[in-house]
From Swiss-Prot:
Gene source species: Escherichia coli O157:H7
Annotated pathway: Lipid metabolism; fatty acid biosynthesis
Full protein name: Malonyl CoA-acyl carrier protein transacylase
Top-level enzyme category: transferase
Active site: 92, 201
Amino acid sequence: MTQFAFVFPGQGSQTVGMLADMAASYPIVEETFAEASAALGYDLWALTQQGPAEELNKTWQTQPALLTASVALYRVWQQHGGKAPAMMAGHSLGEYSALVCAGVIDFADAVRLVEMRGKFMQEAVPEGTGAMAAIIGLDDASIGKACEEAAEGQVVSPVNFNSPGQVVIAGHKEAVERAGAACKAAGAKRALPLPVSVPSHCALMKPAADKLAVELAKITFNAPTVPVVNNVDVKCETNGDAIRDALVRQLYNPVQWTKSVEYMAAQGVEHLYEVGPGKVLTGLTKRIVDTLTASALNEPSAMAAALEL
């Protein structure tokens, strides 16, 4: 059988009505959301199915919703005899989904933890003062240089290395605007402002990371049953303290997604299954390693087909 890995998406993959078809076919989806709702104290399934979108898109609600969606899909896979992947990795928030599915963190603990992570992130930067933008069609070094020159005493830096030619920058709103303009002047095809309220993975997140460290210390971490490639160092840690440390640093350091996918391919992985709503990571895969194939497990037909392999 082809060596495969599971990858778990981060924020941006949520939509109102996500996983409705999966829930109709697999009862464990709603059962998983019921567990999360009990941990949070509100009906998370109702929020994901009925919205409104502006509520679902609040980061402290987006994060538990996406984590739960990914865990629900993984449970469908397990329940129907799916084989264990060779490796796992998650993009930003998705790293928590991977750690739950690899048995490192208890699901209910993780749901509460990512809700707090969202609140800490929102508290760290007053709404309207931070921004993120996707830079399309410019090399990493030129983007880094544009950010350095545009900072002018503020914060702006590359924060998501999503694929060659697709890098997200984040920081103070004005600095992100200046850096976006500088990137276009340097030859970028586009600089697209992202509809987010929090500038994730930049230095402005350090206060949130300090609060997160306190909460992470309260949670039991087990050794992973499947290697999980982390975002910040592109390494598979097995020690609980090392995993905690990587999650703290992840909040104010770039997501090294390009390197993570390259690493998995170098370890012999040939196919990536995206375990979550949407197809963001599936779309990035070919741009990173053209010999890798990828598919999403977010529809009953796709799940059934993958389980038959």
